[in-house]
Regions:
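Repetitive helical segments and hydrophobic/amphipathic motifs
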Residues: 10-11
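Gram-negative (and chloroplast) outer-membrane scaffold detector with strong preference
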Residues: 37-137
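Outer-membrane beta-barrel "beta-signal"
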Residues: 155-168
Length: 168
């Protein structure tokens, strides 16, 4: 019995120090829940689910006009991580966003949303605590569509967000 208990304790302690999973919140231009899975020392997958509040729309002539969107999206990203110093890292990657968007000044218009984005930022893992803090910038391009792609709106979609995640 003691050997089995020792093996279980060793297995749990190794798993506790691996900390390949992170779950937390993002606040800023993008607000929501965030999950990050460290695949290996260079790559990670981060998926965020939440709401955003800004975008720039372009009309058919390519002229920019300001639009204020409230959107609800899921945003999976593939990231390259680079450790800069102990517990400080930079990341760069890309992803897609899928969801719904609504113009704040026209509440009866709800659009489907599909887009691609880049993602760049910095992160910090707090020593002796299972906590990761990050700051990221996500410029992107998205299309808003209404009723079977009858109406397409192109937007420059960008978000700046601060994240805090529990590492496990």
């Amino acid at each position: 019995k003691k050997i089995i208990l020792c093996l279980i304790a060793m297995g749990l302690s190794v798993g506790a120090f691996a900390q390949n999973n992170e779950f937390g919140v993002m606040v800023g231009g993008f607000n929501g829940l965030s999950y990050k899975r460290i695949v290996n020392e260079k790559f990670a997958i981060q998926t965020d689910l939440g709401v955003g509040l800004q975008a720039t729309a372009f009309n058919i002539d390519g002229i920019a006009g300001s639009t204020h969107l409230f959107d609800f999206v899921i945003n999976p990203n593939f990231l390259y991580n680079k450790e800069l110093k102990s517990n400080i890292y930079a990341f760069l990657g890309m992803g897609i966003n899928l969801g719904l968007a609504q113009e704040l000044n026209i509440p009866e218009m709800t659009y489907g949303k599909f887009g691609v984005n880049a993602m760049a930022g910095f992160g910090f893992k707090v020593q002796k605590l299972p906590l990761s803090i990050s700051l990221d910038f996500r410029p992107g391009y998205a299309m808003l569509f209404y009723s079977s792609f009858d109406s397409l709106i192109n937007i420059f979609d960008w978000h700046l967000a601060l994240g805090a995640r529990y590492c496990f």
